Amino acid sequence: MAAAGNRAEIIRGIFAAYLANDRASVEAAFAEDFRFSTPYGENIDKPRYFAECWRDSGWIGRHEIERIMVDGVEAYVTYHCVARDGKSFRNTEFFVFDGDKVSRIDVYFGPSHQDGELVRQDR
């Protein structure tokens, strides 16, 4: 996926793998004790993440990473996503690493828009 120790490249690799529906690469990037939190669920473990949160990326029309900031074992990534139906949103995710594996991701949702209008983001 990425050179060992380059956390920004590891994050880019995870996003590229997600967009390619490459679940095996994403699973390999996550630590065994991985935890995932969003406003809809807290401390979801790795098996539950793939059972309940993983979905085919065919709904995505365009996805752009806007910025990645790395500070030691922690990183933030902000991205803009446009769905094939025209809905768009910006999210920020907080990553924690254990070596070169991601041990935690906390997702912070931004607003969603469609046709220039603010819409409530569905789960």
Predicted regions and their residues:
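Short, low-complexity N-terminal intrinsically disordered segments enriched in polar/charged residues
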Residues: M1-A24, A28, E32, V73, ...
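Acidic-and-aromatic substrate-binding clefts and catalytic sites of carbohydrate-active enzymes
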Residues: E42-I44
